[in-house]
Amino acid sequence: PYINGKRRPHIPLYFLTSNFSFSGAEALPFAFQSLKRAVVVGETTGGGAHAWIGKIATDRFYVHVPNAYSSDPKTKKDWEGVGVKPDIEVPAKDALLRAHIEALEKLAKSDTAKTTLYNWHLETAKSKLEPSIVLDHATLHSYTGEYGSRRVTLENGKLYLHSNGSKLEMLPMSKTLFRIEEVNILRVNMVLEKGIVTAMERRLAFGDSYLVPKAK
């Protein structure tokens, strides 16, 4: 049937899968993967391509009888018993982030007017996938203090930025660079001179940055 709207055959598509994806949840990624129209990200699926109906065989037995199946019209293959193997294999819990990374990498290359913004969010996504950076107490404590109208505190091993009445957790991306989950266009970089923290650099996703000296 006719579907109203603009065709967009070149827009990248991603399917997220797990080993619990089964039957109908496998059909679409299988079909689009076979057509090379989408990227499957996650885990190999459960492998249920053959439909069945239940039949009472005797007064003691009830059987499942296969009555339909889906297959690739070219190869005649299906995913029964083997599942749909992902193009990018990662644990299911990481599939969405991994798909974000793939999409952002393509956007950063294709849309040069927004490369800076896409690379910003790409760095954020990659930092979420990497093992958490652990900073020692002395390093964390050295970052606390007053920075203009803002303040950094240390509570239970975590740094918090207090700004305009908000208390925002600072998540480390490196030894000095922190992202703010609640404000994804803001990062905080601690500036050191000869090992001493002298300022906070507020970086914004669009490329701007502001240096705020630390109070003595």
Positions of PLM-derived features:
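Central antiparallel beta-sheet cores of small beta-barrel/beta-sandwich binding domains
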Residues: 153-188
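Short, surface-exposed beta-strand/loop "edge" segments at domain boundaries and coil↔beta transitions
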Residues: 71-74, 166-170, 184-190, 204-212
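Short polybasic amphipathic segments
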Residues: 70-71, 158-162, 179, 198-202
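C-terminal "post-core" interaction segments
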Residues: 1-141, 194, 200, 207, ...
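Short acidic-hydrophobic surface loop/beta-edge motif
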Residues: 53-58, 147, 178-180
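Loop/turn-rich, solvent-exposed surfaces of beta-rich toroidal or solenoidal domains
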Residues: 4, 148-151, 155
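Calycin-type beta-barrel ligand-binding domains and close structural analogs
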Residues: 156-160, 203-216
